């Protein structure tokens, strides 16, 4: 068995969509003590559809630039803060505790219009069987 535990403090952040910070906590590229081997591949079937789990932060008055993902959908879980999200032509307010679903191939952007940092978990998942194969 291979145990994977990842703390955001041990991950280098990257700039996300020009305005936010993103800590990629888990992805298909996550390594433990080497490459993910055949045994791990068999045991972690759910990872075949997950492209990433990230901790994201967005400062007040900033927005992610509008973007879309051709090969995966996303779910955001809002940990802290408030703002609004635009998905396609629809706009909705959000606050801590909300879960937001974003379909693949759909233009979206998130805006922090509150006074504190927006912090959220972003889960990316392949639709269909693109990553894992099979039918």
Question: Where are the regions that the model predicts?
Answer:
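Histidine-centered metal-chelating micro-motifs
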Residues: 63-65, 84, 100, 104-110
């Amino acid at each position: 068995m291979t145990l994977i535990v990842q703390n955001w403090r041990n991950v280098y952040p990257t700039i996300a969509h020009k305005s936010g910070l993103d800590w990629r906590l888990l992805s298909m590229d996550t390594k433990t003590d080497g490459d993910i081997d055949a045994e791990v591949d068999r045991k972690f079937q759910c990872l075949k559809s997950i492209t990433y789990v990230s901790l994201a932060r967005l400062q007040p008055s900033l927005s992610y630039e509008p973007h879309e993902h051709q090969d995966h959908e996303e779910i955001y879980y809002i940990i802290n803060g408030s703002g609004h999200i635009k998905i396609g032509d629809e706009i909705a307010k959000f606050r801590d505790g909300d879960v937001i679903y974003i379909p693949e191939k759909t233009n979206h952007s998130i805006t922090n219009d509150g006074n504190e940092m927006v912090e959220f978990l972003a889960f990316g998942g392949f639709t269909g069987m693109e990553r894992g194969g099979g039918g």
